């Protein structure tokens, strides 16, 4: 009996009710978890993450801010939780605009500080604009979002490859997917101006897939876009979230390939392989 009770408890922990989560629903554990993370960030969690990997400080703040954007999008405008989401996402974005967040990245890249820094931070900036009615959006925030979009578009237009560098001589396609998604977001919020750049990027990216799984590779040559590493589950998990924003049809087809080759539940628990099943 005790074994059965333990198994039941574990299944409940591993398999939350997915019906409570979705584009128009907010799981009851989301806000408490975010409040916990907000306290941790204010006590130096970002700095501790920086000790673990080069983008630790930046990534923890940007994902925290983006999670609050998702909360805000599920709340009635001007409700208490919507206003808290706006405040916390703004707080996170302000931290990304400081030297501590920019320190790992090179100003000499195109765009300055690289596609990872500009793409992710501008996606958060665009999320903040989404949370606010047009007449309430701070002009400085609008101007900065549009300026960063122009810088990204110019960098893509000048680049011999669809995958811009995040560091000198190093490029990860997922970062360019995020950056192109910000251009799509711009053309949703404002009069369209980046359609040609986005379409050119889609055509070039589709010519540079990892041929075996037919998916975007995790790492490429920054000068040619040549695949340096085969598709991996961690990278594809991020690609799946953003590619559908760029091209819904291609995004869904890439997601289907990803699920078929990388998603592998184990004993009822959701799981994602880092490599396809045939690779050990």
Task: Cite the ranges covered by each PLM segment.
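Structural helix-adjacent loops and short alpha-helical linkers that scaffold large soluble proteins
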Residues: 16-31, 71-90, 128-146, 187-199, ...
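Non-transmembrane, interaction-prone segments in cytosolic or luminal domains
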Residues: 2-13, 48, 71-72, 83-95, ...
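Extended ligand-binding clefts on enzyme/binding-domain cores
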Residues: 116, 143, 159, 169-280
């Amino acid at each position: 009996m005790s074994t059965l009770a333990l198994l039941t408890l574990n299944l409940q922990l591993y398999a939350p009710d997915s019906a409570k989560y979705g584009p128009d629903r907010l799981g009851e554990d989301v806000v408490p978890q975010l409040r916990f993370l907000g306290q941790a960030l204010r006590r130096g969690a970002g700095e501790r993450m920086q000790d673990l990997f080069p983008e630790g400080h930046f990534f923890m703040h940007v994902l925290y801010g983006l999670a609050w954007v998702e909360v805000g999008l599920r709340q009635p405008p001007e409700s208490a939780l919507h206003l808290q989401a706006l405040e916390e996402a703004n707080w996170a974005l302000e931290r990304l605009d400081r030297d501590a967040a920019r320190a790992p990245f090179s100003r000499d890249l195109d765009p300055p500080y690289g596609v990872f820094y500009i793409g992710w931070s501008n996606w958060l900036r665009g999320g903040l604009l989404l949370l606010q009615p047009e007449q309430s959006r701070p002009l400085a925030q609008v101007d900065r979002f549009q300026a960063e979009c122009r810088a990204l578009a110019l960098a893509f237009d000048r680049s011999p490859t669809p995958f811009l560098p995040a560091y000198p001589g190093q490029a990860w396609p997922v970062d360019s997917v995020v950056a192109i998604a910000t251009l799509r977001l711009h053309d949703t919020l404002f009069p369209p101006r980046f359609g040609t750049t986005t379409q050119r990027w889609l055509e070039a990216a589709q010519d540079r897939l990892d041929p075996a799984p037919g998916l975007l590779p995790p790492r490429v040559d920054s000068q040619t876009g040549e695949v340096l590493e085969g598709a991996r589950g961690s990278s594809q998990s991020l690609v799946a979230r953003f590619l559908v924003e760029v091209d819904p049809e291609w995004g869904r087809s890439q997601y289907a390939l990803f699920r078929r080759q990388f998603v592998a539940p184990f004993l009822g628990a959701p799981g994602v392989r880092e490599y396809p099943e045939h690779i050990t």
